[in-house]
């Protein structure tokens, strides 16, 4: 794998996890959707709804590195953020392959999909103390009941919450 592909793949995974975006939203990101000065990313969600998500420090670093590598390898600095080897917009199938290959390379035995990263982002935000309504906005859900489906509370988190908040713990 060349440096360009390695940087792209790392950034694809980071965008999926850091923003909790859907794979279709990832594929639709254009360079103009990124504001590195203000550190936010504009996503085009279901039903043509747009939402703004923050760019965290790790994603910021990976985006800068990827954009630098991308611009070095490509004469065409076209709009789509993620491009295939044939310089077309990266598609869903390619993203699934990137996730599967990366999981295999790091010896993850369970079945991993791009949506797994979305679920993980939501769960980790909740475990970190974020309220459900904020996670709903972050994920671009119109209903909080949809957000509840996406989240899993770990046994450890539940035990800790019980111990810290229940008077008879």
Q: Where in this protein do the model-derived segments appear?
A:
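Conserved catalytic core of the tyrosine transesterase superfamily
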Residues: 4-169
């Amino acid at each position: 794998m060349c440096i360009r592909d390695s940087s792209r793949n790392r950034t694809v995974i980071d965008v999926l996890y850091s923003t909790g975006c859907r794979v279709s939203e990832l594929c639709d990101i254009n360079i103009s959707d990124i504001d590195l000065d203000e550190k936010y990313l504009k996503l085009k969600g279901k039903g043509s709804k747009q939402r703004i998500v923050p760019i965290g420090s790790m994603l910021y670093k990976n985006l800068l590195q990827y954009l630098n590598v991308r611009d070095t390898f490509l004469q065409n600095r076209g709009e789509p953020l993620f491009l295939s080897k044939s310089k077309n917009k990266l598609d869903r199938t390619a993203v699934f392959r990137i996730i599967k290959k990366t999981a295999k390379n790091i010896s993850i035995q369970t079945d991993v999909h791009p949506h797994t990263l979305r679920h993980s982002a939501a769960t980790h935000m909740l475990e970190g103390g974020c309220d459900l309504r904020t996670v709903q906005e972050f994920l671009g859900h119109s209903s909080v009941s949809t957000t509840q489906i996406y989240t899993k509370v770990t046994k450890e988190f539940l035990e800790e919450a019980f111990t810290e908040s229940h008077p008879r713990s």
